[in-house]
């Protein structure tokens, strides 16, 4: 049996699977989990694939991209996603996490897929809310948006950031869909003086790119190496990975020269 991942409208990958382990459907989402010989379990969420053996790559990169460029990480907001492993990584800092996800049925169906599901959900500093309006009014050090936000969402979320806060959002991969990345950079650039694209180096199974945005904090100039060296139980993230994430080939430097703000 095979499952197909759509990388772009014109590019697809196929993966061999052995069996389907789970099929859960809600009003807005479809989650299927498969058993794979090469990749362990594979979750397909609305045609996007998550590989259980490689969950740590994105969660470590995004968590510590924010955590190691900020002196303090006291308040974190995660919206538009299901990745509880991201929260697990963020708990390496002395932080409180607000996690906004309305689809409890799908979130709870990841119970056996996310290795630290119970640990995160039971943490006293973790709050799960169905919508932003359910949360106390506060300012955040770090906001992570796990789907590409439109300008209205950007406008709302940036008002929730502290003056030196960091906003990280998912975008299209800059190499595969550079026009979409350009548009995402332009949208964020209308609200932030610092907007820089990055990817996960050596991650070959993803079609995602990301954008680091901030009013004051710079992902390279403000990187704190001692914080990186103090991290424990990480398998992917280090200083080299952090810096390499922002490297662009010459042709993309030219493509994005009017969109990157640093």
From Swiss-Prot:
It is an enzyme of class 2 (transferase). Its main location: cytoplasm. This is Polyamine aminopropyltransferase. S-methyl-5'-thioadenosine binds at residue 29. GO terms for biological process: spermidine biosynthetic process. SUPFAM superfamilies: S-adenosyl-L-methionine-dependent methyltransferases. The keyword Cytoplasm applies. It holds the Pfam family Spermine_synth. It is found in: Cytoplasm. Homodimer or homotetramer. Its EC number is 2.5.1.16. The active site is at 155 (proton acceptor). InterPro entries: PABS, SAM-dependent_MTases_sf, Spermi_synthase, Spermidine_synt_N, Spermidine_synt_N_sf. Residues 1-249 form the PABS domain.
């Amino acid at each position: 049996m095979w499952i197909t991942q759509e990388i772009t409208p014109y590019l697809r990958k196929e993966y061999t699977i052995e069996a389907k382990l789970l099929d859960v459907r809600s009003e807005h989402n479809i989650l299927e989990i498969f058993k794979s010989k090469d990749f362990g379990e594979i979750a397909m969420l609305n045609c996007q694939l998550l590989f259980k053996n490689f969950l740590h790559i994105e969660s470590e990169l995004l968590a510590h991209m924010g955590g190691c460029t900020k002196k303090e990480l006291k308040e974190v907001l995660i919206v538009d996603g299901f990745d509880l492993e991201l929260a697990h990584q963020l708990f390496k800092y002395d932080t409180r996490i607000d996690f906004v996800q309305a689809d409890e049925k799908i979130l709870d169906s990841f119970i056996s897929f996310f290795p630290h599901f119970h640990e995160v959900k039971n943490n006293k500093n973790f709050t799960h809310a169905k919508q932003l309006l359910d949360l106390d009014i506060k300012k955040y050090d770090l906001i992570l948006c796990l789907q590409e936000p439109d300008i209205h969402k950007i406008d709302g979320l940036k008002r929730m950031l502290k003056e030196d806060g960091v906003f990280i959002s998912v975008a299209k991969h800059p190499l595969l869909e550079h026009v979409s990345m350009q548009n995402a950079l332009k949208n964020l650039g209308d609200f932030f003086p610092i907007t820089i694209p990055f990817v996960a180096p050596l991650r070959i199974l993803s079609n995602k790119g990301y954008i680091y945005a901030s009013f004051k904090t710079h992902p390279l100039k403000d990187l704190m190496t001692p914080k990186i060296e103090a991290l424990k139980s990480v398998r992917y993230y280090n200083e080299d990975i952090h810096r390499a994430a922002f490297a662009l080939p010459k042709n993309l430097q030219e493509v994005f020269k009017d969109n990157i703000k640093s």
